[in-house]
Amino acid sequence: MLFDSIDHIAIISSNYQKAKDFYVDKLGFKVKKEVERKDRDDFIITLEAPNGILIELFIEKNPPRRVTRPEAAGLRHLAFRVQDIEESVEKLNKKGIETEEIRIDPQNGKR
């Protein structure tokens, strides 16, 4: 697994298969629970990392559009803590996941 820790987070997606492929097949999360909510016409997939951290994937066919600016309301980014950032980037790239260049946060000095 690529991560040491992350807090619980809920993420909305519109594509069940793509979301499940990305989080389960590429990042290595395990499906802990999957619920179809027929009354809402959606799914909730609870994913678990080896350290017990959870991600709830809400799969909605027509989620509201989000403004693309980073400053827009909603999730801005998802940050993972890793032992070796270069090694983790290399592993992600080998799985076909595009990454940005490694940056240093001017506020906290973290990469």
Residue ranges and their predicted role:
Residues 1-2, 35, 46-48, 89-111:
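Vicinal oxygen chelate
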Residues 18, 85-89:
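Short, conserved charged micro-motifs
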Residues 19-24, 92:
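Conserved active-site tyrosine of GNAT-family acetyltransferases
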Residues 30-69:
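Conserved short beta-strand elements that form part of the metal-binding/catalytic scaffold
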